[in-house]
């Protein structure tokens, strides 16, 4: 009887875990618009962390940087290297855009693992990393699309659209389709990786003691950083491609 009761309780626990709903959201009604509240809240927190950290680090700049200033200068140099490698000698104006993308995604991804979002109760859904929501990743991908269209049109004018019939006009539909698949691949890659990582950690924490999921959480932090780098690198590569021509 005890064995049967234990089995029933175990199955009930597994059923409860399988019943975790994905896609429950908290909305704000502003006028006639429905605003995704939980994503805005977590995004504002991430932006506040970035602005606060940068302000503290550079509030008293030194000729020989130390501490936070040294760290931020290293990050800036890293972003410059990525931008220059992918875009070329005209990378300068695009460093702020690539840097903003990288830092926002990096801090957003890490916030999902390091910040205790779950302690804040919402009427519907729960707080999580901004990049855990498809709306955020699609918005970032669309911004990237606007950026590389702007870069190409600024550099080449209307001649930019000539790339769609190169090397042969037969490839026109494929070249047009490519511009739609770029933001799709960027958004779904980032969203899928971050969502999968958080779901795996939640399930492991529910099934096994706290210490066991720690290696998975550390791996998640590593892959979160890699995803931010991949997104920023691809964004820079698309901008560089639009400025140089069809490859």
Curated annotation (Swiss-Prot):
| Primary residence | plastid
UniProt GO cellular component terms: chloroplast thylakoid membrane; plasma membrane; proton-transporting ATP synthase complex
Presence of the UniProt keyword Transmembrane in the record:
yes
Q: Which SUPFAM superfamilies match?
A: F1F0 ATP synthase subunit A
Pfam families for this protein: ATP-synt_A
A GO term for molecular function = proton-transporting ATP synthase activity, rotational mechanism
Its transmembrane ranges are 38-58, 95-115, 134-154, 199-219, 220-240
What keyword terms does UniProt attach to this protein? Answer: ATP synthesis, CF(0), Chloroplast, Hydrogen ion transport, Ion transport, Membrane, Plastid, Thylakoid, Transmembrane, Transmembrane helix, Transport
Q: Where in the cell is it found?
A: Plastid, Chloroplast thylakoid membrane
Q: Which Gene3D superfamilies match?
A: ATP synthase, F0 complex, subunit A
UniProt cross-references to InterPro entries, sorted A to Z:
ATP_syn_F0_a_bact/chloroplast, ATP_synth_F0_asu, ATP_synth_F0_asu_AS, F0_ATP_A_sf
| Membrane-topology annotation of the record | Multi-pass membrane protein
Q: Subunit arrangement?
A: F-type ATPases have 2 components, CF(1) - the catalytic core - and CF(0) - the membrane proton channel. CF(1) has five subunits: alpha(3), beta(3), gamma(1), delta(1), epsilon(1). CF(0) has four main subunits: a, b, b' and c.
Q: What does this protein do?
A: Key component of the proton channel; it plays a direct role in the translocation of protons across the membrane.
Which family would the database say this protein is a member of?
A: Belongs to the ATPase A chain family.
NCBIfam families per UniProt:
ATP_synt_6_or_A
Q: What HAMAP family does the database record attribute to this sequence?
A: ATP_synth_a_bact
What is the official name of this protein in its record? Answer: ATP synthase subunit a, chloroplastic
Recorded source organism is Nicotiana tabacum (Common tobacco)
What phylogenetic lineage does the species belong to? Eukaryota, Viridiplantae, Streptophyta, Embryophyta, Tracheophyta
